[in-house]
């Protein structure tokens, strides 16, 4: 027992954390700052007085006091970057970084994040102007009655209005009346969801998620959920409304998906993740995220933790949660009831004596103090929510009864509390439980009706070898009756991917079946196989007969086109697996070819063979995750007219153009023996599919100018700013299949293909491919798309399409106000900027520059140089943060430290500084004084690359500034700053774009376009 732990906060949550940590045999002492009367003087728990806003001083305190780790209770320090700042100087801190804590500190960020990662939440919009917010409230096609301040508002920034007018009034109070200060500069307007609200928390080390038992809070002040909103008047755990299956679903679809998404976006999330969830009739939906334990949820969850909390936190900090998953008490329930001061949540009195603690403890109850203080040796009230009484018993009803006894024992004048905590759970447990299979979500009668509807559709696909009759346990196929003598079988399975999402959003289900069949039969065609029969798998949460019939009708029609029988399938109705209106598809095709007709014939393929491209009908069924993201960022909806040149249809209809089925048209060509290989251009595009049918030492060179690239690809390239490689690796770019034939057989092969009404042309040649070289090279792809996407303007073609370069990731180092920081922030927010500020680092805490960055939503770190023994150690700490944020360019904006040689050499050509004179004149820290002393009439500023010698780096840009009669250092400095604000962003843009770089000879190199 040697460890000392620091808990930050002063509420009931922090008292509970300290109480649980003190139970560990590893812990010698738990310090709490600022703490309350409950944490002031027990055997292992005591308060300490150290500022939590001065992270530098706090870090030094932790080092001096040999603190093993810090546990942060409330949200504000997390949002202020306490975790990153302490970790950066070697003090372990439990909780998410400021960047990860945006899930709570910015509701707008959280909602956008959930949309990006497919996490179910209420429909919403964010606004910075009250009128626009109110217009949306009045016109939304859903009840837009939930108004949230986007920033932190101490748990009070959510207003649930009863009418549109009340919602608009809430907007005005928040945005114009500044009810929540800066937190309300942006408001989020949300759909009002119906259902029960539960709290689902988990521990996570950034990868593993360990759910806690679900809890339910009671926000309203009075019994029956009446009265004003509060921070919480009580809670119970576990919430029986959340079954084990539902909790697993919440873990997988919400908690794990959130943690994985933060990892993918470069913001690993560690600590406690709290999801406030509404249990709607359409499944669980996230109301909000918190980045710490809830209060009072903490007071009912941690008492049920069987594991050592100290060990759990250590495993999370070590990234080893998977090896030490927490264990919870079985067959127990916990209830906590809050006792509040008279007048809460409005004005309340302080200093009222509290009695009865020994009596409550004698009942076996835990009393966790919150708004309390010690005065003359007595415990007195010191806040709105004063304390919580927690009971742990074998069931919820018993726990509530015991908690009520504690409420009777503890007394203070004007105490307010609820006696009905857990009433929803009790009502739930008392409900009758007789259910039918249909009530559980599976309608057998509807399934049988569907089978009867699709039987004739399947029957119509019968062919030699197979007489389809649905309803048996399996289907049969007679190869001999189909005319085969020495056959090989080929099989393939596939799905449609997220093209389904567009079909479901557009309510267009009649063509998606052809996509499914085509993806499977085209795959086996690449083996030379004739498709014989097909089986489908259709799964949904709730069977909709009209939708399902439309999909399977499309499958049956596609099977007829392909010449294969729809031999059978499976329709699975699985409640809770899919949201209403959603379904998934999978297909399975079996085909055959005579043994001597198997493809590819690798031994026949030689250098110089021709590659014939078969036109696609459009996107086919690949790349739709990218397509959907591009459409979401564009100005178009799926219901919008298609882009110019793409036909008279909606964008949704265009994207849903079904995949071509090539089996009937290409089989005669393949059986001629002239074709050596066929590649189906599916997932992986041109670059990854053609090599699958080539010998290892061969590749192909393709020329995009030889085939017609449909306009939709040009539009996607423009809107997504996609590179040539991204296009060729994701999409078919107009080629649905590629055939390899000898050069002397090209003419006859093309004639045969065209006889079957397929568009075909020679698109390239087979070439030798040295080891390590790309197997597929596509020339002129972007140029062809640019011509497609050009418009005639003043008699010349104007190009609308360009590949958007990747934005450079920029770190800014400051020591104070960050004199040029705001100019850099403003410029990098312009759409044309090629730079993006990802981190602001200061060597001093609580400076104005950090406020500017945090207001702009930019992560910050404080790395105090005084805590390091030398410059090299300090620079190493900075470098670690730069690497953590994958920094490309470093800007020094009023950074008053001389950097070490190794650091400067590492960032040579990637680090910019600005000096307030026209270098090489007037170097050093007092440039303005030198200018005035010299009596010159012109000075200025210089942006330069940083070199080891101070102010000696290569010059990027300069701006002249006049020295006026009567100038002082102050007036001249202000004039020069205006020029700095102009040229520093310009120089950053030049370096980020690659127009300026530092050459290998150490000289400036300007890159010009011909």
UniProtKB/Swiss-Prot annotation:
Cofactor: Mg(2+); Mn(2+)
One annotated Gene Ontology cellular component of this protein: cytosol
Note on how the cofactor is bound: Binds 1 magnesium or manganese ion per subunit.
Phosphothreonine modified-residue sites: 682
Residues where (6R)-10-formyltetrahydrofolate binds: 871, 896-899, 913, 947-951
Keywords: Acetylation, ATP-binding, Ligase, Magnesium, Manganese, Metal-binding, Multifunctional enzyme, Nucleotide-binding, Phosphoprotein, Purine biosynthesis, Transferase
Residues annotated as domain ATP-grasp: 111-318
One Pfam match: Formyl_trans_N
Reactions catalysed according to its record: 5-phospho-beta-D-ribosylamine + glycine + ATP = N(1)-(5-phospho-beta-D-ribosyl)glycinamide + ADP + phosphate + H(+); 2-formamido-N(1)-(5-O-phospho-beta-D-ribosyl)acetamidine + ATP = 5-amino-1-(5-phospho-beta-D-ribosyl)imidazole + ADP + phosphate + H(+); N(1)-(5-phospho-beta-D-ribosyl)glycinamide + (6R)-10-formyltetrahydrofolate = N(2)-formyl-N(1)-(5-phospho-beta-D-ribosyl)glycinamide + (6S)-5,6,7,8-tetrahydrofolate + H(+)
Domain of life: Eukaryota
Protein name: Trifunctional purine biosynthetic protein adenosine-3
Organism: Bos taurus
């Amino acid at each position: 027992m040697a460890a000392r732990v620091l808990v930050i906060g002063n509420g009931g949550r922090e008292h509970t954390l300290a109480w649980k940590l003190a139970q560990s045999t590893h812990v010698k002492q738990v310090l709490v700052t600022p703490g309350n009367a409950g944490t002031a003087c027990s055997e292992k728990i005591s308060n300490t007085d150290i500022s939590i806003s001065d992270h530098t001083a706090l870090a030094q305190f932790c080092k001096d006091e040999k603190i093993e780790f810090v546990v942060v209770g409330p949200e504000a320090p997390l949002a202020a970057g306490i975790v990153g700042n302490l970790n950066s100087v070697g003090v372990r801190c439990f909780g998410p970084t400021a960047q990860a804590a945006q899930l709570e500190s910015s509701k707008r960020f959280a909602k956008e994040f959930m949309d990006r990662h497919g996490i179910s939440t209420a429909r919403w919009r964010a606004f910075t102007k009250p009128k626009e917010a109110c217009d949306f409230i009045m016109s939304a096609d859903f009840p837009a009655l939930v108004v949230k301040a986007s920033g932190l508002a101490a748990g009070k920034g959510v207003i649930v209005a009863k009418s549109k007018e009340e919602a608009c009034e809430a907007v005005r109070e928040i945005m114009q009346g500044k009810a929540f200060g800066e937190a309300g500069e942006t408001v989020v307007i949300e759909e009002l969801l119906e259902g029960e609200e539960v709290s689902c928390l988990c521990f996570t080390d950034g990868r593993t998620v360990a759910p806690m038992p679900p809890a339910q809070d009671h926000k309203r002040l009075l019994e029956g959920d009446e009265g004003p909103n509060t921070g919480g008047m009580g809670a119970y755990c576990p919430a029986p409304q959340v079954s084990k299956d539902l909790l697993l679903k919440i873990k997988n679809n919400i908690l794990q998906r959130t943690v994985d998404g933060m990892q993918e976006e470069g913001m690993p999330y560690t600590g406690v993740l709290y999801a406030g969830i509404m249990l709607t009739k359409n499944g669980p939906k996230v109301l909000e995220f918190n980045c710490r334990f809830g209060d009072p949820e903490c007071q009912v969850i941690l008492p049920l933790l069987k594991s050592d909390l100290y060990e759990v936190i250590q495993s999370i900090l070590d990234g080893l949660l998977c090896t030490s998953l927490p264990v919870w008490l079985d067959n127990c329930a916990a209830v906590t009831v809050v006792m509040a001061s008279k007048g809460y949540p409005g004005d309340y009195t302080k200093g009222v004596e509290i009695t009865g603690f020994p009596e409550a403890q004698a009942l076996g109850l835990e009393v966790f103090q919150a708004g309390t203080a010690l005065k003359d040796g007595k415990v007195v009230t010191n806040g709105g929510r004063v304390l919580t009484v927690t009971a742990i018993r074998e069931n919820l009803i018993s726990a509530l009864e015991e908690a009520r006894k504690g409420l009777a024992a503890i007394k203070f004048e004007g105490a307010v509390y609820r006696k009905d905590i857990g009433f929803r759970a009790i009502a739930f447990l008392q409900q009758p439980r007789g259910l039918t299979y249909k009530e559980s979500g599976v309608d057998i009668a509807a399934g049988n009706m569907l089978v009867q509807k699709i039987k004739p559709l399947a029957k119509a696909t019968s062919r030699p070898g197979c007489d389809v009759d649905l309803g048996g346990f399996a289907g049969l196929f007679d190869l001999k009756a189909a005319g085969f003598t020495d056959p090989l079988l080929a099989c393939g399975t596939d799905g449609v991917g997220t093209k389904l999402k567009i079909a479901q959003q557009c309510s267009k289900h009649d063509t998606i079946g052809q996509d499914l069949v085509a993806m499977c039969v085209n795959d086996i065609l690449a083996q030379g196989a004739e498709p014989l029969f097909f089986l489908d798998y259709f799964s949904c949460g709730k069977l909709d007969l009209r939708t399902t019939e439309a999909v399977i009708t499309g499958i049956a029609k596609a099977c007829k086109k392909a010449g294969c029988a729809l031999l059978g399938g499976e329709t699975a109705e699985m409640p809770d697996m899919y949201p209403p209106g959603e379904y998934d598809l999978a297909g399975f095709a079996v085909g055959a070819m005579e043994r001597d007709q198997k493809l590819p014939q690798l031994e026949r393929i030689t250098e110089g063979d021709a590659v014939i491209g078969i036109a696609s009908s459009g996107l086919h069924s690949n790349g739709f995750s990218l397509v959907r993201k591009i459409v979401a960022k564009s100005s178009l909806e799926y219901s919008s007219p298609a882009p110019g040149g793409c036909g008279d249809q909606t964008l949704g209809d265009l994207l849903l153009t079904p995949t071509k089925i090539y089996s009937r048209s290409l089989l005669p060509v393949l059986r001629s023996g002239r074709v050596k290989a066929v590649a189906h251009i599916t997932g992986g595009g041109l670059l990854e599919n053609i090599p699958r049918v080539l010998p290892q030492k061969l590749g192909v060179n393709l020329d995009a100018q030889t085939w017609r690239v449909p306009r939709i690809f040009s539009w996607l390239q423009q809107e997504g700013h996609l590179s040539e490689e991204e296009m060729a690796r994701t999409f078919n770019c107009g080629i649905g299949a590629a055939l390899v034939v000898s050069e002397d057989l090209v003419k006859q092969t093309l004639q045969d293909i065209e006889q079957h009404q397929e568009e075909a042309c020679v698109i390239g040649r087979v070439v030798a491919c040295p080891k390590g070289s790309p197997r597929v090279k596509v020339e002129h792809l972007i140029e062809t798309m640019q011509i497609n996407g050009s418009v005639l303007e003043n008699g010349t073609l104007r190009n609308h399409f360009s590949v958007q370069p990747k934005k450079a990731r920029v770190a800014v180092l400051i020591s104070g106000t960050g004199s040029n920081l705001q100019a850099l922030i403003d410029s990098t927010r312009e759409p044309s900027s090629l730079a993006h500020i990802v981190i602001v680092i200061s060597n001093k805490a609580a400076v104005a520059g950090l406020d500017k960055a945090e207001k702009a939503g930019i992560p910050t770190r404080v790395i105090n140089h005084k805590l390091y023994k030398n410059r090299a150690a300090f620079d190493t700490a900075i470098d670690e943060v730069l690497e953590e944020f994958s920094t490309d360019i470093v800007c020094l904006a009023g950074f008053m430290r001389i950097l070490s040689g190794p650091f400067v050499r590492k960032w040579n050509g990637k680090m910019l500084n600005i000096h307030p004179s026209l270098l090489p004149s007037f170097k050093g820290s007092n440039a303005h004084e030198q200018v005035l002393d010299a009596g010159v009439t012109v000075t200025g500023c210089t942006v330069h690359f940083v070199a080891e010698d101070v102010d000696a780096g290569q010059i990027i840009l300069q701006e002249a500034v006049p020295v006026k009669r009567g100038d002082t250092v102050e007036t001249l400095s202000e004039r020069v700053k205006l020029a700095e604000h102009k040229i520093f962003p310009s120089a950053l843009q030049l370096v980020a774009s690659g127009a300026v770089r530092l050459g290998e000879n150490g000289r400036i190199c300007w890159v010009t376009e011909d």
